[in-house]
């Protein structure tokens, strides 16, 4: 099995992106799966283009994209991505699409086909705070998750794909009072455990993972 895992470069005035740094730290072989790492730009369209180029090059079985979600307390596999770009801030090339569909011929939303609840269970069972997230936002993270799942739906039907958001690391919250963070080692461990769960689970487990609101 080949797993392509991507991480964004820093954005929004940050000098580091824990998503990318954690991706760099994970092993290149997990439960017999080959792990291929890719840095992508925090830029609308270009991020997707780079991922599709890599898909064409290596023909992966799984594509997992990792992004930073400052303010979250744990590692959060995403359930769904929506067909909407609505950028609160500019991306790294100054683009700021507002209320624009990602793909005009795409569905309103695409759901991850990764075993997200099994991933959460694997992390929690090993001491990593984790939960299912039901929104990937409307910035480049959602753009990438939706775009990859669109490509899976249209062209690469044998690929399993999804997205994981990770918290800030401690150095990022020094001047952000009351903002949660997680060590880069724990984030990397969470990603490793998530890949383990993907390798070991063709189908997701049935367990509570929803939210009231």
Curated annotation (Swiss-Prot):
It is an enzyme of class 3 (hydrolase). Pfam families: Peptidase_C15. One of its GO terms (cellular component) is cytosol. GO terms for biological process: proteolysis. It is found in: Cytoplasm. GO terms for molecular function: pyroglutamyl-peptidase activity. Keywords: Cytoplasm, Hydrolase, Protease, Thiol protease. SUPFAM superfamilies: Pyrrolidone carboxyl peptidase (pyroglutamate aminopeptidase). Disulfide bonds: none annotated. Homotetramer. Belongs to the peptidase C15 family. Removes 5-oxoproline from various penultimate amino acid residues except L-proline. This is Pyrrolidone-carboxylate peptidase. It comes from Clostridium perfringens (strain ATCC 13124 / DSM 756 / JCM 1290 / NCIMB 6125 / NCTC 8237 / Type A). The lineage of its organism: Bacteria, Bacillati, Bacillota, Clostridia, Eubacteriales. The gene is pcp.
